[in-house]
Swiss-Prot record:
Functional summary from the UniProt entry: Hydrolyzes ribosome-free peptidyl-tRNAs (with 1 or more amino acids incorporated), which drop off the ribosome during protein synthesis, or as a result of ribosome stalling. Catalyzes the release of premature peptidyl moieties from peptidyl-tRNA molecules trapped in stalled 50S ribosomal subunits, and thus maintains levels of free tRNAs and 50S ribosomes.
Alphabetic keyword roster: Cytoplasm, Hydrolase, RNA-binding, tRNA-binding
Keyword match Cytoplasm: yes
Origin species: Teredinibacter turnerae (strain ATCC 39867 / T7901)
Protein name: Peptidyl-tRNA hydrolase
Source organism phylogeny: Bacteria, Pseudomonadati, Pseudomonadota, Gammaproteobacteria, Cellvibrionales
The protein's assembly and partners: Monomer.
Length: 193
């Protein structure tokens, strides 16, 4: 057992021009979760994002979608975590993952940023603490490192987008276990699905 998740952060870029792009897979996850639970996200400028509180497995969980650009996500995460006294190891950051194919989602505890600017900024904002959980939503890789920036900022074709949504749905089913602190069960369910 590990510390239970009490804050879920969905990474993305603000603005309609970035809506439903591959890079916003984390943001889409949190927005869909809030919508499914009937809890609208509210613009909360003091925390640099849209926030709400949900109940999962009888526990309060804070949701956050930063209104900062991806590379400044740490400002929002640190603000909300500090305000509610949420330790880094109680945070789950949901983000796009180039190294996983569309249709795949993986959980991970701690580690580096892997070149992801949102994770890099969160690690720095949390005092170089890397022990937060990550839900990695696969978006695939364009095959050429020089194409990554344009690739992640584009919308996925419809068939690929459906695969990303399927992975998000599978990941959502693990949240009750994560809130209970049962990362092993959540990983087993998600990684063998």
């Amino acid at each position: 057992m590990r510390n239970p998740v009490s804050m879920i952060v969905g990474l993305g870029n603000p603005g309609t021009e970035y809506a439903n792009t591959r890079h916003n897979a984390g943001q889409d996850f949190v927005e869909n979760l809030a919508r499914a639970l009937g809890q609208p996200l509210v613009n909360t400028p003091k925390h640099f994002g849209f926030t709400t509180r949900i109940s999962l497995a009888g526990k309060d969980v804070r949701l956050l979608v930063p209104t900062t650009f991806m590379n400044r996500s740490g400002q929002a995460v640190a603000s909300l975590a500090n305000f509610f006294k949420i330790a880094p190891d109680n945070i789950l950051v949901v983000h796009d993952e180039l190294d996983l194919p569309p249709g795949t989602a993986k959980l991970k505890i701690g580690g580096g940023h892997g070149g992801h600017n949102g994770l890099r900024d969160i690690i720095a904002a949390l005092g170089n603490n890397k022990e937060f959980g990550r839900l990695r939503i696969g978006i695939g890789h364009p095959g050429n490192a020089k194409q990554v920036a344009s690739y992640v900022l584009k919308k996925a074709p419809a068939d690929e987008y459906r695969l990303i949504e399927d992975a998000q749905t599978a990941a959502e089913r693990t949240l009750t276990d994560l809130v209970a602190g049962d990362w092993e069960k959540a990983m087993r369910e998600l990684h063998t699905a």
